[in-house]
Regions:
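Basic, Lys/Arg-enriched alpha-helical interface segments
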Residues: 1-65, 74-79, 88-111
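Conserved catalytic cores of phosphodiester-cleaving nucleases, focusing on short active-site segments
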Residues: 82-83
Length: 111
């Protein structure tokens, strides 16, 4: 069995977001994360946002787009920190959500 290329850490907000979704949706989100952590390279599942250090886990379920924002921490071990999630309603990722993830990232590395 292949070793994961990163370990996912969920903030409380990201955890709450996933737990509040229907079980089938949260299962698919975790399934897609597991695929990416296992080494699958697929921009439909995990994509770096332009002009940012923020990435998004992308899940499509019943024509609804779910996004979980995240960033990398490779200091001691390879971690991906998931900051928060949204149910995407527009084509473009809302800039306020990217800014929120960037603020959480900045605070994380300050400590």
């Amino acid at each position: 069995m292949a070793q994961n290329i990163f370990r996912l850490v969920l903030t409380d907000e990201a955890q709450t977001f996933i737990e509040c979704l229907p079980e089938a949706v949260s299962y698919k989100i975790y399934y897609n994360i597991k695929r990416v952590a296992g080494g699958e390279r697929n921009k439909e599942l995990f994509k770096k946002l332009e002009n940012s250090e923020i990435w998004e886990f992308r899940t499509l379920y019943n024509k609804t787009a779910y996004r979980l924002f995240a960033f990398w921490d490779k200091d001691k071990e390879t971690l991906v920190i998931a900051t928060h999630g949204i149910i995407k309603k527009t084509q473009k990722t809302p800039s306020k959500e990217i800014a929120k993830a960037e603020a959480i990232r900045k605070e994380y590395f300050k400590n």
